């Protein structure tokens, strides 16, 4: 995608102390290994994304009603990076969001364009995605290829996890894309099991 870069590796991220984990695995009574492929997916909520933006010239204030799962971050990003206004000049309301499956947590161009345009035309502007819009523009779950290893003692207690994941980030990063296969993923791998 980017000809000026030497490879398509976006970043290499680690959590934990590799030498300590390797030592735990060397002493483990049992090590089990799993290769896992998580396919790319498209969330498909019944309720598509939608937004209504309105500018109030009297108070120099915007209101955005949007089907966002994360209205506070939308307000932060739009205030700081899109409209260049203080956060208190933008109210973001997320009423009945409907289904989302994570795809409505991102900041989308439609929200920014509607909000900006509402000031230009001095009228409220609304938009609702149709199914084709959703398939083409909603953030998708990127595929991951993972090798996971679990070190156990003789009684089956977890001693440690060692995981290597290659995550397809796509050509361009979305709002939360870097966090999903790294911090959000790695810190949840053990689930509810006691793992040192």
Positions of the model-derived regions?
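Structural alpha/beta core scaffold segments of enzyme domains
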Residues: 1-196
């Amino acid at each position: 995608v980017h000809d000026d870069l030497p490879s398509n590796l976006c970043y290499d991220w680690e959590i934990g102390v590799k030498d300590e984990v390797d030592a735990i695995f060397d002493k483990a009574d049992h090590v089990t290994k799993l290769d896992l492929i998580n396919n790319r997916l498209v969330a498909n909520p019944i309720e598509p994304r939608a937004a209504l933006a309105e500018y109030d010239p009297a108070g120099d204030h915007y209101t955005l009603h949007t089907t966002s799962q994360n209205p506070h971050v939308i307000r932060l990003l739009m205030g700081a990076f899109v409209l260049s206004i203080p956060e208190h000049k933008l109210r973001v309301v997320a009423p009945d969001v409907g289904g989302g499956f994570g795809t409505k947590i991102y900041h989308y161009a439609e929200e920014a364009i509607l909000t900006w345009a509402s000031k230009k035309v001095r009228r409220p502007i609304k938009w609702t995605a149709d199914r084709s819009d959703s398939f083409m523009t909603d953030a998708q779950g990127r595929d991951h290829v993972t090798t996971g290893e679990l070190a156990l003692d003789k009684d089956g207690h977890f001693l440690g996890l060692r995981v290597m994941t290659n995550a397809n980030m796509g050509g361009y990063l979305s709002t939360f894309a870097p966090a999903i296969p790294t911090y959000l993923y790695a810190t949840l791998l053990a689930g509810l099991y006691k793992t040192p």
